Every structure is written in structure tokens, then in C-alpha cells.
Amino acid sequence: MLRLVCAFVLVAASVARADAWKIETVETPGAVRELIELGGEPRIATASGWFSVVTDGARVRLEKAPPPRFPPIPTDALPDGRIAAGKREFARAWLAEPTNRYGHGVLGDTIEAGALVVERKGGRRETVRLGNDSVFEDLEPRIADLGGGEKIVAVKSYLAAGSALAVIGERDGQFAILAETPPIGAPNRWLNPAGIADFDGDGAVEIALVRMPHALGRLELWRWSAGKLLKVAETGDTSNHAIGSRNLDQSTVGDFDGDGVADLAIPSFDRRSIRLLSFRGGIREIARIKLPAPAATNFIALASQGSPEILLGTADGKLFRLHR
């Protein structure tokens, strides 16, 4: 196996706490095309093929790796969708029943999902099917522990009113949409989830989303409590998606200030800076790290010597490592 040991070139960084966070260029064999996680392990695609990522103390190594092998896609699944794996009650879930009834095309084509399929651990499948007034404008359902049990978070878009965030789970023995945020209010208006965690340390789980990441860039925090979604915080100057891209994970969750509470790493509205945000006791910017070009790939969270790190690619094909 060919092994590539990466060299790191320090780049000037504009940060809110310059002594705490750095940005380094990771020299790669060719332009970076894609960052994914496969079985919990990071994989990076460049013009020269696929590489795995290995942390070694204060350094990161890229090792040549075979192309990833994804599980077979069910016949009813969205063609460009991804299968989500559960940990407890659910085996997996996917978006299904492709439809072209909503022509927004923000994710690269006008084919969206008309249904969500959940497969239990024993193999039994349940389908949540939408009416003709809406679609799932998403690529992968997010399985998360909300309120003591696994539930699914997905983007539901109304043909006449735009996107809402939907929480799907079991009610009276059947799967259904348990709650959703109000839709944006106009067609072709979309939102993108950014992270799911207890962001303020109160024991309840919040869902972070960016409302209209291409036109408004408003980050909102919605708490799941007693079967309902309650907006508890919001701020501007964020984005986690580029129009037409299938990269929906341009953000990541980690404890970036060391206080034991989850924080959020997310691009600024122009995607030329990475903002590290804390929500404990109010919204606070831990650091703002300037990028040489707009963020373009999914983010991958790493841990080196007990500290969180972030890998991401930019629109000019470069790979960057953000760390303390």
C-alpha cells in the first residue's frame, strides 16, 4: 500500500482567539474532490484517488486507500440518496419514492423523495409517505437520540410554502411526523440542518439548522421537548451549503472551547470563514478562522491529543486542518 505522509504549511489565520486556533494547509496529491465518513472513518477523494486519514500525535497522515464500498441501495431509494444507520431501535433509514413534483433543484437535480423508509432491527420496514403537497428535500435522514429514543430528522418542503424541519418517530405503533417547524413561507426556500446535540448544557437536545443558507444565512436552534420543537436561539452570518451541491455536512459538532458542552463549527455566510459557536449562556463566537477560499466539502471532525480538529476542503481544491 502506498503511504503518503502529508506536509503541513501554516497559513495566516484571522481568528477571534489567535493563540488558540490555527489553520494549516494539508498538501495532497491533486485537488480535493470529496470528504466523507465511512463506518465512522474519514475518507478523502482527490484527483489521485481515495485516501484514509490517520492522526499521529500532532500530525495527520493520509494513506492510500481503495475506493469506498457502499451498501447496496434499496430499489425504492432516492438515486443520489444515502442510507443512514441506526444504533438502537433502527437498523437503517432512507429516502424513497423519487418524484419530480417539486422543481426547486437546490441539491443538483429536481428529483426529491416522496417517502421515508425505516427498517427496524428485526427487518420490519415502515414507510412515512407524504401527500402531493410536499417532498423530502434532502439526501439522507439523520437518526438521532431525541427524548430518550431514536428519531429521524429530515427536511420536508412544501410545494407552496418552502422547507420545514421534520422529526419522525413512532406514535401509537406507527411511524409518523411527530413535529415540524413552521415552513419558511414561500416555495423554493430551503433550510439545511447543521447539527444535533445538547448545545447549551441543560440536558435537552437541540437541532441546529440554517434557514435559507444561500439568501439569508440565519442559524436557528430548535429544542426537542415534550414532543414539540421550540426555537430557543438564532443568529445571522452563517451558511452550510452551496447551490447545486450534494455536500450537506458543511458543519460539525465538537467541544471547541473545552467547557464540556457541545459547540458548532459552521461557515460564515460567504463561506470564507469558519465560525466556532458556543450556545451555553447565550450565543458566543469562540473563534472565527479565515479561509483562503470558500468552504466547499463536507466537514470531518478529528481528535488529536484530546483536542477537536476539523478537516475541510475549499472551492480551489485545497485541504485544510483547523486545530489548536
Model-derived segments and spans:
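Sec-dependent signal peptide recognition
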Residues: M1-A7
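Hydrophobic h-region of N-terminal signal peptides that target proteins for export
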Residues: F8-A18
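Beta-propeller-forming repeat regions
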Residues: A18-R324
